[in-house]
């Protein structure tokens, strides 16, 4: 079982006099410097927080917590955030507020849904799965899709990539595919990783309980070497087993990546899920 607990995290529940809102978002990440607020840069978080403050007529700034933090250029079809706001907003029509938010936001961000979150909901810590897709075009992409697909100049062997991807499924230490961070862990459960042919090329779909920094783009980069015939189907598993970040693993461009969906625990299990997620995982889980 996990032992140590992550510190300096936001409270599990809203403070006295506040309620928690859940907002579902979609955005084109092309012109954003990622999700997280950064001084003098346009980010999704800063744009959404400004719009929330205006739409709800709040004097104090709004702070949002995101379910899946995205890097510069990464897109989202199913992002989820929460924000704690004064109880007075309960007098508002959330449908009208969502409409107002979409009027305040630029066209590359859209509010898909806005509701009062159930007890125990936390956009980050109550999640049980996150799903991403990564798309390649066959050769030069259609100009209308160039911001969402990465060109592949060689025919990709989808069967070989699926064979290699299957070897990475389950609970593993994905350090070999994650950029180093001071905190956290690289132990993840990869539930889905498959490839399919699309109208424009090839798409990978990955779903895990969580992903560490650059994990999706690095795994995809590793698998492309298999699809192009440069490596055998056992190569990604050999890289995984090193448990060391490999310089030879290419991190693919951001614009081919889309956060598709975040799945949450049932309402009656939200608080329990927070406790599980906040616990830092260690190698003993894999050994057992």
Report the location of each language-model feature.
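Structured-RNA-binding interfaces characteristic of tRNA pseudouridine synthases
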Residues: 2-288
